[in-house]
Swiss-Prot record:
Organism per entry: Homo sapiens
DNA-binding region: 116-207
GO molecular function, one term: sequence-specific double-stranded DNA binding
Name of the protein in question: Hepatocyte nuclear factor 3-gamma
Superkingdom, taxonomy of origin: Eukaryota
Amino acid sequence: MLGSVKMEAHDLAEWSYYPEAGEVYSPVTPVPTMAPLNSYMTLNPLSSPYPPGGLPASPLPSGPLAPPAPAAPLGPTFPGLGVSGGSSSSGYGAPGPGLVHGKEMPKGYRRPLAHAKPPYSYISLITMAIQQAPGKMLTLSEIYQWIMDLFPYYRENQQRWQNSIRHSLSFNDCFVKVARSPDKPGKGSYWALHPSSGNMFENGCYLRRQKRFKLEEKVKKGGSGAATTTRNGTGSAASTTTPAATVTSPPQPPPPAPEPEAQGGEDVGALDCGSPASSTPYFTGLELPGELKLDAPYNFNHPFSINNLMSEQTPAPPKLDVGFGGYGAEGGEPGVYYQGLYSRSLLNAS
């Protein structure tokens, strides 16, 4: 036990060092905010403004009790105390191009004006191309090429907008197709502006057309065609309505002819209504085909026949003992009563 104590005391006597009073340095207070910064710099070589080899050699002698290097120049290089802050002066801290492209583009980003879609319609583009040509006429392929040379936007999706160009040339009267002359061989016809379509755009501004150009001949032809169709339509309607009117209109009864005095003191009205001879004079002059010939004359004395419904004179109510020849009805049958009733009610309603 004593030996171990002696050995510990011996070790302490050998390894302990007590400096003299003149060799003691003044104490240096460390900066609390820069301590974690220096430790971070030593661990992360990418964010350090110094080469990977470490800090540059200090002019002061390095010793076990040497004061730390001044941290004043490190402040401006790390204003944000971040990974990429203050690294613009060194190539080690600059982010690579992949990091920049990997980020999302800002919301206010727009493509360059040279590649933006021009604010012109297809008719305006065709008009500009034709007016810029020396001969004031261009083929379809030349119009395509002129548009692509002037506006880089139309160098993509060519099939889509070229179809629109063809439709605009075909369905607008302001563009005229000109055949090739023999001295200018080639493929495709020329397209030119109509001579009367010079005022489509106001003061040479192609952003919007002042008015749509239409040929007056087509308008006149369209109006005359509509007029002829209306005339034909009215004429045909009149022609179709005429036979209907003739069919539906009842024949006008002739003035009543004097009839002989009835025998046995019977009423004349009852004889007129009951006898079939009273309706036969109306149709004696008509020559009907064999299919339309009327076999029995009693059909015109039906309670709902045209003669009974449209006659001006209301027949007197017949006696109950008088029957119809064709029907063979007895005197007390209710059909006789309904005949006079319906004829009077329809006449009053009209």
